[in-house]
UniProtKB/Swiss-Prot annotation:
Protein name per its UniProtKB record: Large ribosomal subunit protein uL22m
Family stated for the protein in its record: Belongs to the universal ribosomal protein uL22 family.
Subcellular location: Mitochondrion
Stored SUPFAM superfamilies: Ribosomal protein L22 (SSF54843)
Gene name, Swiss-Prot/TrEMBL: MRPL22
Length: 204
């Protein structure tokens, strides 16, 4: 009698375990078959580049500051528009533009720029805080997290929690002059030159 009871309890326990696994109790964000999800720090490692000594008459090499913020709870596409807005501006002009923007990403980028500005003075021997301009400013796709979206009639779907990265590069000195917009004649000349540069593949 005791053996029969134990067998029934064991069968119920196995069924319960199978039910939990089928319902997906384990977090799906930790179940993957891809490569390692370790975050690459290539952007920050550019701050550690050591250049060879300069010649006596050579002009001084401007300081370059690489900074970023990762896993921001924001869309990479919305962040890209703000990143492109301040590209090529001086640091003060970029901060002024972001100050009067009501978007969530603008305040995040402003915090990153202030951190990079402090880093320039503290770690890269930049004398004047305002003598910087944004050479590169872009966003990237972060690590998305999968979650369950509950539907009616006991059904469900999979939704993604989106995250993004923001990267910025500051360079010491005044910003370069803006490029003049291309005219229709310039576009036509470039198109004709591309046609002339065509080659026939697998030919002599």
């Amino acid at each position: 009698m005791a053996a029969v009871i134990l067998e029934r309890l064991g069968a119920l326990w196995v069924q319960n375990l199978r039910g939990k696994l089928a319902l997906g109790i384990l977090p799906q964000s930790h179940i993957h078959t891809s490569a390692s999800l370790e975050i690459s720090r290539k952007w920050e490692k550019k701050n550690k580049i050591v250049y060879p000594p300069q010649l006596p008459g050579e002009p001084r090499r401007p300081a370059e500051i690489y900074h970023c913020r990762r896993q921001i709870k924001y869309s990479k596409d919305k962040m890209w528009y703000l990143a492109k807005l301040i590209r090529g501006m001086s640091i003060d002009q970029a901060l002024a533009q972001l100050e009067f923007s009501d978007k969530k990403g603008a305040q995040i980028i402003k915090e990153v720029l202030l951190e990079a500005q402090d880093m320039a003075v503290r770690d890269h021997n930049v004398e004047f805080r305002s003598n910087l301009y944004i050479a590169e400013s872009t966003s990237g796709r972060g690590q998305y997290l999968k979650r369950i979206r509950y539907h009616g009639r006991g059904r469900f779907g999979i939704m993604e929690k989106v995250f993004c990265h923001y990267f910025v590069k500051l360079v010491e000195g005044p910003p370069p002059p803006p490029e003049a917009p291309k005219t229709a004649v310039t576009h036509a000349k470039e198109y004709i030159q591309e046609l002339r540069n065509r080659t026939i593949i697998h030919a002599l």
